[in-house]
């Protein structure tokens, strides 16, 4: 009788950050580092889901909807003598729809993988590392937040998308990749991928979203609570949000010991979440912020400058593994995870990847 497969230690690494940094090449370099007993499985960006699995192309659709929002916003600003406070409702609805399309494959994959995981425990079967090209937080929070700063979606749209973030299984490690702005622009221009958005306002808004995400996770993991100090926060008005998407303004800094004012929550303290000018935040919005806080507090966050070559960046990520959280999976899950990685890579990116040895 065959001996049952032994339990595995599973390390999940989500490479994230603004687009055009080199996350995908770093992920592929990590997959190439797979060795017996220390397998690395790579789950690439789900480009096919966005571009070919539906009648409409999500990248083209969201670019068109964003342009419509920008046109409406500029018209409102001229009429009111200042920045528009809200996005055009119809165009914002389209942006939110396409943003949900971006989130869907990540949410589906996240649910599939999470079902195989358990809290950490003895794992005599060795370690497998799962490397994902982005976490659901990218499509559910960071990119919607950037669009919120640009008034392409409204606060209620952002909370709706953020509420879709799934509960986190044990062992989630988020590696936020960074680059100097000029190098990011150079890499974006060099890859020249159709559908890439490279306007300076959007890029700085996304970069700020990730800096605030790092601060928010650190604040929450240190025991911070958004409800403590919420009432004392200043209102995030249209000018404050516009500054987060203004290349001429200083970018947000990743603070060593962030306070509530250094987090995403501060930018969500806006009057549009208080219907009719009420004095209190509606309970349903507060519950959404509670849920968001719970999801983000579960993430172990690392920051990686990816200026170096992909192999060097991959080595730097592997050097972080001893400090990373892990989950456990039964021995049979190893083969299931390898199959998932092959299927996902083939369907989403047209890549036929082999599973690592030992799984």
Curated annotation (Swiss-Prot):
Residues bound to ATP are 17-24, 187
Output the GO biological process annotations, alphabetical, semicolon-separated. DNA biosynthetic process; TMP biosynthetic process
Q: Which reaction does it catalyse?
A: thymidine + ATP = dTMP + ADP + H(+)
The main enzyme category here is transferase
Superkingdom assignment: Viruses
Q: Which Pfam families match?
A: Herpes_TK (PF00693)
List the molecular function annotations (GO) for this entry. Answer: ATP binding; thymidine kinase activity
EC annotation from Swiss-Prot or TrEMBL: 2.7.1.21
Where does this protein hold substrate? 99, 193
What interactions and quaternary structure are annotated? Homodimer.
What does the sequence similarity comment in the record state about its family?
Belongs to the herpesviridae thymidine kinase family.
Protein name per its UniProtKB record: Thymidine kinase
Its taxonomic path starts at:
Viruses, Duplodnaviria, Heunggongvirae, Peploviricota, Herviviricetes
């Amino acid at each position: 009788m065959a001996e049952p497969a032994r339990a595995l230690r599973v390390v999940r690494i989500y490479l994230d950050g603004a687009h055009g940094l080199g996350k995908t090449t770093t992920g592929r370099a990590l997959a190439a580092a797979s060795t017996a007993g220390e397998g690395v499985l790579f789950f690439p960006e789900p480009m096919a889901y966005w571009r070919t699995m539906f009648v409409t192309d999500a990248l083209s659709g969201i670019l068109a909807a964003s342009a419509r929002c920008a046109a409406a916003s500029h018209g409102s600003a001229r009429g009111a003598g200042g920045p528009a406070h809200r996005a055009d409702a119809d165009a914002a609805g389209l942006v939110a729809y396409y943003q949900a399309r971006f989130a869907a494959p990540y949410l589906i994959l996240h649910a599939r993988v999470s079902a195989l995981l358990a809290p950490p425990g003895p794992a005599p079967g060795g370690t497998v590392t799962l490397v994902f090209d982005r976490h659901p937080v990218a499509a559910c929070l960071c990119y919607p937040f950037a669009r919120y700063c640009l008034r392409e979606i409204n606060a209620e749209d952002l909370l709706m998308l953020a509420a879709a973030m799934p509960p986190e299984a044990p062992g989630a490690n988020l590696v936020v990749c960074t680059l100097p702005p000029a190098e990011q622009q150079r890499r974006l221009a060099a890859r020249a991928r159709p559908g890439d958005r490279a306007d300076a306002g959007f890029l700085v808004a996304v970069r700020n979203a990730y800096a605030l995400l790092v601060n928010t996770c650190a604040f929450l993991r240190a025991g911070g609570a958004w409800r403590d100090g919420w009432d004392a926060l200043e209102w995030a008005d249209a000018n404050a949000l516009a500054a987060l998407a203004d290349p001429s303004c200083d970018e947000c800094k990743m603070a060593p010991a962030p306070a509530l004012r250094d987090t995403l929550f501060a930018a969500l303290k806006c009057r549009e979440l208080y219907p009719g000018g009420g004095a209190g935040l509606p309970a349903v919005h507060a519950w959404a912020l509670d849920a968001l806080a719970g999801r983000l507090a579960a993430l172990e966050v690392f920051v990686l400058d990816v200026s170096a070559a992909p192999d060097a960046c991959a080595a730097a990520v592997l050097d972080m593994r001893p400090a990373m959280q892990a989950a456990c999976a039964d021995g049979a899950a190893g083969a299931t995870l390898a199959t998932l990685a092959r299927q996902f890579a083939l369907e989403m990116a047209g890549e036929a990847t082999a599973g690592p040895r030992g799984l």
